[in-house]
């Protein structure tokens, strides 16, 4: 993969470099053909050692956070679901980072194919649109990427410490708090990495649809036999490109399957844990973290929402290709030329068969419907948790009243 032969990958390169610094994805230089073989091996070995050191740091910090959690639980006498959820939360963090390193190792070739497919598709789409007017400009994608992902990364990095630093509690050393904040940011950046690839696919779909719309315009204005034959060739080429984009979506979904599954599970469990501790500490009149907890819940929810929203954009744009084909099918040229009519029918059948789905290994689809279902499920668990806590507090107060009554009777 040569990043300089793809303007889309060149626009996404700064974001990929950020993710590689945090150990989330290999540096894009690993996939270039200009790097000397021996030097490339040394760089890969050095980066592997860097990833191992990150994993060791994550394991140590999770251990330190578990120790601090036990002290918090003992202080507030909350040895119920809080301990289970807290320990599960920390184990999920370790699992995500360990799997991320394994994913880099096991799916290195798949990621290389994804980069190659993106670059090849961009070149082929540019070649296919060379005979038409009104081509899309690459700088629009750079602006969309900065607005959709770059701005959110800035907000994540800036707001995560502000919302979560105080909530880490008094039992962690300041160095542990700083490293924990870095780990929390790294976790959420994995979702933005997925968003970058989704937006790359979205741009490819937009270009493919734009070419199809130009073919439709040409069919309306020019219906000579030679022109229609040339447009049928362009239509077939566009059909093949749409099929390749569908295959690219499957590759990206497979690459992010377990990473996103663990991240979504972690975010949902973290929101439940935040609500749990908000209920536990609600009896404290000096509690100052309630609004920050709301901010943390919003950050985690918006991070999932954006990945679902951008995936939904891709799906809706891909599905709009069928509407363009239907409009072309209604043109008089489709009635006059059988080859065009058969080409449109074949393309339409392909679109019906190759449905665009962003999925996590078949466990769930990443779209707005999934996000809505996740929110409803999360609210259901929160209601159950609140009911459980109210019952627990009522029993605790009742037992305290009985003990105080017995103590007064005994002293009397």
From Swiss-Prot:
Q: Give the transmembrane region(s).
A: 8-28, 41-61, 149-169, 182-202, 245-265, 295-315, 370-390
**Positions glycosylated per UniProt:** 403
Q: How does it sit in the membrane?
A: Multi-pass membrane protein
Q: Which GO terms describe its cellular component?
A: axon; dendrite; membrane; neuronal cell body; plasma membrane
Which GO biological process entries does UniProt record here? monoatomic ion transmembrane transport; sensory perception of taste; signal transduction
Domain of life, source organism: Eukaryota
Which UniProt key words apply to this protein?
Answer: Cell membrane, Glycoprotein, Membrane, Receptor, Transducer, Transmembrane, Transmembrane helix
Give its localization. Cell membrane
Instruction: Mention any Pfam family matching this sequence.
Output: 7tm_7
* Topology Extracellular: residue spans: 29-40, 170-181, 266-294, 391-412
Q: Which InterPro entries does the record associate with it?
A: 7TM_chemorcpt (IPR013604)
Name the predominant localization. membrane
**Side of membrane Cytoplasmic, spans:** 1-7, 62-148, 203-244, 316-369
Example of a GO MF term:
ligand-gated monoatomic ion channel activity
Give the record's family classification. Belongs to the insect chemoreceptor superfamily. Gustatory receptor (GR) family. Gr2a subfamily.
- What role does it play? Probable gustatory receptor which mediates acceptance or avoidance behavior, depending on its substrates.
Q: What is this protein's name?
A: Putative gustatory receptor 98d
- Species, as recorded: Drosophila melanogaster
Q: Gene symbol?
A: Gr98d
